[in-house]
Amino acid sequence: SERLRYLIPFGQPHEVIEYLIRVADEHPGAVTVFGDDGEKLGTWPETHKHCYHDGWLERFFNVLVENQHWLQVTTFSEAIDHTKPVGKIYLPDSSYREMTEWALPAEQLVEYDRTVHELEHDPRWPAVKRFVRGGFWRNFKVKYVESDEMYSRMMNISRRLEQAVQAGAPHEIVDRARAELYRGQCNCGYWHGAFGGIYLPHLRNAVYRHLIAADNLLNEAQGRPERWIEAKAEDFNFDAAPEVQLANDRLNALIAPRRGGHLYELDVRSICHNLLATITRRPEAYHRKVIGGGNNGNGSCASIHERVVFKQAGLDQRIQYDSYPRKSLVDLFYDHGVTLEAVAAGQAAQRGDFVGGEYEAKLRRNPDRIQVLMIRDGQAFGMPIRINKGLTLEIAYLLEGLPQDRPLHFAVEFNFAGMPAGADDRYFYERHPEQQPEFPNRYGQLGTRLDLSGAQGLGLVDEWLGIDVGLTASQPTGFWTFPVETVSQSEGGFELVHQSVAVQPHWLA
């Protein structure tokens, strides 16, 4: 019962009884079902005071006792055992109403909300609202490509698990891998609505942590040697186009040649962490509320579906959308005088067609290494340019066709996720290409904007995670860094969330 979901605990206890009386009058002997999150009774914002200090829960139990002469509290199993079936019904693929609304694309959700609010004042609404529904849950995998990336990774590991079972792999290892796979299927990080969901980095990181752990165990079950490397080209994300996987005993990399030649997953096996569990900033229907401001009005305890709370000031000024995915090996051409501020704000014009353009990919296998070579003949500033980028888990770029009479401003973006800002044990430092000093020069926390020139390299450290990422260049290079932050909604309200660190080495080529 959707009505009970909103009345418990946000309505008065007597309103619950009044609703149940109406149901009993219209349908004698009916079973009314309430099933919802236990967090509503004390964990969600303001509900602990409401339920316990203000006495809602005690008053609710009291009215149930007072009406027990006609109202029986029961369980699902008891209802099945003692209630005669009324008939047969087949349910479609579905979820609760709000979830189907959240699955809609942002612009359609805005139109849906507007239409529903208009129809609510129509006298026919009580009769027709049951026929009004939103979207399909699986559309979350289209609305958020990051959800689809997790889903695709999960499905491929599930397939590997089945292959291991069929091959007679050791049961103990297979069982551990299966448990990790199931943990990686926890749905919370795959969608987004009134809850933080996919916008919460710790949920995405947790999904990948378990999936990578399962992958590692399956490598063990397969009996791989201590040192190994492999490369495969197949449709890993079910988009009818081949991706490339480079993997060894330490790392796993997934590259999408037809989507800008981006590196979209980079797993560090030893800590079960995907450095590219990033998210791209996109419009959300609720951003209208952030821009408009507001609150839930009377100060009473409100459902999270109705609350408008800002966890930080000035969030309307922090909303920003990305014009390309926040991944790595993103090839960018800028005007000469572009600034870090313009790049970080997404206001720097793109002068090339390489950001999302299709690259031709080739796998090169040698006895001592495997390389993915990606080539695109495109344009920058109206001139034909060829970019060759080779990835061996060491990256090499060759730009051909550069004009002789003018330099071009070229940058490559990398993103690093799961390395939060705002902590002294997570920081940038000066990276040296040869001998690294014991105590390198620090540039500040990972949320710092840096505009470095003539640098040989840049390092990023997360001491808590236990990782040191180093970028070194073959010649002095400019480095830009800036945080990627979203304004998103959770049960606590609207908040600014650090998602990744963007690093752009850039050159006048």
Residue ranges of predicted features:
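Solvent-exposed beta-strand/loop surfaces of large extracellular or lumenal domains
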Residues: 421-443, 483-499
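Extended lipid/amphipathic-ligand handling interfaces
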Residues: 385
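Acidic (Asp/Glu-rich), glycine- and aromatic
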Residues: 260, 264-271, 278-284, 290, ...
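Beta-strand-rich recognition/accessory modules
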Residues: 349-382, 392-404, 454-509
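Active-site and substrate-binding clefts of carbohydrate-active enzymes
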Residues: 3-251, 256-260, 268-271, 464-466, ...
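Surface-exposed interaction patch
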Residues: 412, 417, 425-437, 447-478
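Acidic-aromatic substrate-binding/catalytic surfaces of carbohydrate-active enzymes
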Residues: 249-362, 373
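Terminal, compositionally biased non-globular sequences in eukaryotic proteins
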Residues: 189, 199-202, 206-226, 346-355, ...
